[in-house]
Every structure is written in C-alpha cells, then in structure tokens.
Amino acid sequence: MQTLVEQIVYISDMFGTAVFAFSGVLVAGRLRMDGFGVMVLAAVTAIGGGTIRDMILGATPVFWVRDPLYIWVVIATALIGMWMVKLPRRMPWYVLPVADAFGLALFTVIGAQKALNFGTSGLIAVLMGTMTGVAGGMIRDVLAREVPMVLQKEIYATACILGGILYTLSLEVGVDRVSAMLISMLGVFGLRVAAIYWHLSLPTFSLQRN
C-alpha cells in the first residue's frame, strides 16, 4: 500500500507526463503532422527519458509497461491537445512553461531516486535525473528536425543538474527523503522559472573562422 507521499508523487508524475506530452502535441501541430505523428511526439516527449533511464539501469520491464496508465495519459493528452489547439481562445503564454518547469523538477527527482534505488553513485543519480528530465524533449526535437533545446543556450538541462546535485547532497548530509525532494524540486523549478522570466541563458561557444 502506498504512503500519502508516494501517492502525491505518483499523481504529480502523471501531471508531469501530461504536460510533457502536450508540449509534444504543440510541436507536432506546428509541423502539421497527422494524428499518428502527434501521438508519437507526445509519447517520446513524455516517456522517452524515463524509458532510456530504465533501460540503462536494467529496470525492466520499463515503467510504462508495468503501469500502462502512463500510456493512457499520453493518449488522452494528445487527443485533448489536438482539440484544444483549435479553440479560438488561447491559454496564457506562461502556463505551459511554468507547468513544464514543475514536470521537469519532478522528473529529475524521480530519475535520481530510481538510480539510487539501484545502488548507483551520486554522480550517476544526477545523470539519470537529468536524462529523465530532458531526453524525451531531445528525441522530440530530433524527430522534428530541430536543434534540441538542451543543446542551445536555454537553462534547461542545467536546472536538472542543479536539482540532482541538491537531491543527492541533501540525502548525503542526512536530510530526509521528502525534504530532499522538496529542496531539489524548488531548485529546479526556481531556476527554470527565473530563466523564463528574466530571459537568462548560458554563454554560447562560437568558433571564429578566418
């Protein structure tokens, strides 16, 4: 039987899955894909990172095979998303980025904790948390023939890395798991929202040609 905290994390995980899936729907709509294309981009965005994480860790069957509700959430989000984008009234621009920041924070913590459950080091936990948060979006962008956002100057993967470090260090110094999750999520969410609001970005590397 799940504890209250585990239930809250599970419900939040489903919310994050829906948010990530909806971002895939928006990209597919911008590229004028058919219904199948919408489903594919929604799915890879929402569950791609966690799938790669589970395969690397040897956590098979992967999470959405063990719990098909993730797939149903993706399908429902894709169908609702295709209907919503046709509505005359648009949602405020900041709703999706802020919701995405929450999903990113949660996915980072879930990925890091799952790695720790498999006995990995803190470094690997940080990498797995980051992968859970960003790999799905990278696959989506590659399929859309775009440069993945995490490879540009956006503060996105950096926020995941920060969150993973905060989580593993908090556990290392004796902070309880719930508090460590909150500290990590606040770090990821706060940095990502600050980057959106103040247009913060990382310096870029440019090779000058003579």
Swiss-Prot record:
Superkingdom of this protein's organism: Bacteria
Disulfide bonds: none
Cell compartment(s), UniProt: Cell membrane
GO cellular component: plasma membrane
Principal place of residence: membrane
Cited InterPro entries: Gly_transporter
Entry's family note: Belongs to the UPF0126 family.
Protein name (Swiss-Prot/TrEMBL): UPF0126 membrane protein
Phylogenetic lineage: Bacteria, Pseudomonadati, Pseudomonadota, Gammaproteobacteria, Aeromonadales
